[in-house]
From Swiss-Prot:
It holds the Pfam family Complex1_49kDa. This is NAD(P)H-quinone oxidoreductase subunit H. It comes from Synechococcus sp. (strain CC9605). GO terms for molecular function: NAD binding; oxidoreductase activity, acting on NAD(P)H, quinone or similar compound as acceptor; quinone binding. It is found in: Cellular thylakoid membrane. The keyword RNA-binding does not apply. The gene is ndhH. Keywords: Membrane, NAD, NADP, Plastoquinone, Quinone, Thylakoid, Translocase, Transport. It catalyses: a plastoquinone + NADH + (n+1) H(+)(in) = a plastoquinol + NAD(+) + n H(+)(out); a plastoquinone + NADPH + (n+1) H(+)(in) = a plastoquinol + NADP(+) + n H(+)(out). Belongs to the complex I 49 kDa subunit family. NDH-1 shuttles electrons from an unknown electron donor, via FMN and iron-sulfur (Fe-S) centers, to quinones in the respiratory and/or the photosynthetic chain. The immediate electron acceptor for the enzyme in this species is believed to be plastoquinone. Couples the redox reaction to proton translocation, and thus conserves the redox energy in a proton gradient. Cyanobacterial NDH-1 also plays a role in inorganic carbon-concentration.
Amino acid sequence: MTQLETRTEPMVVNFGPHHPSMHGVLRLVVTLDGEDVVDCEPVIGYLHRGMEKIAENRTNVMFVPYVSRMDYAAGMFYEAIVVNAPEKLANIPVPKRASYIRVLMLELNRIANHLLWLGPFLADVGAQTPFFYIFREREMIYDLWEAATGQRLINNNYFRIGGVAADLPWGWLEKCRDFCDWFGPKIDEYEKLITNNPIFRRRIEGLGRIEKEDAINWSLSGPMLRASGVPWDLRKVDHYECYDDFDWQVAWEKEGDCYARYRVRIEEMRQSLKILRQACDMIPGGPTENLEAKRLNEGKGSDAAGFDFQYVAKKVAPTFKIPNGELYTRLESGKGEIGVFIQGNNDVTPWRFKIRAADSNNLQILPHILKGHKVADIMAILGSIDVIMGSVDR
């Protein structure tokens, strides 16, 4: 008896760019053999706004409000890196109190970033309840930001070359301590709901496994790298701001799958709480901004000393000039390494301003880790990467 052979042709399916699980306007062109993923091609650029060119036509103070629109979950990190680059190029020291305030804002943003990752990721794999819980905690972080900067989510416009825009208001540190005391048990609540939940573990354990060598070769960073057995955290490696003053550990796992990335982010929130508590207790007094960086140092032969500028009301704003030279600086955001390559030519605007977004690099490994998985696993693996398309496309 002859047996008929069944042949299936590969099928090409479009995911996005308007699919609710796409985490933004990301389009995936997926080739399927039945239920199995054969190939995947990410299509990006739908949210490109020319941020680097905007930076090259703005002074630093003018550009700081723009940057939090790139990654609305990590606005403080982008504000920090945008002012760190000219600071290091011009060797401008930052007062100790300002550095502590920066750390407080960055660690609050790290917790907010991980919370905004946690809710949609769990919704992607079928757990709806934690999605509503995370906004309860984020609301308290919004209140802290609003008290210090005037804005809640983005456009905080708080970081400045040489420090921060304003000191913390009276009672802010006590409110931050209250948040730390309140949020610690909430992480335990998440772990009780999620971490050892057998349905959750069977759903994502073993998915999207990335080996240690692959993570390094693909230039991954942040939880994507640390979940694959590489304890690399720029807060420990580069010793920027005042992180060396605090006692905390790098969160990392060895398995390299979606579950390991979840464990890393949960532990990072605990470590951020430790840093916040220590910063609230140890913050010194003193100025919050190096005002010398704002001084207009033009010299006698400059137009600023001429008749027109002095007597015809054409007052020159105290704009910092970026000195000649080039420099790359980086910091550890909630998603990984974000960096800026800046090239100055003794002008108020940079000649070149290149932004390295962490999730842009992390997204590139997606086709590599999707091959061989089922079509239903695409959303779980993509969700574990933590992408915001504003910073991917820039």
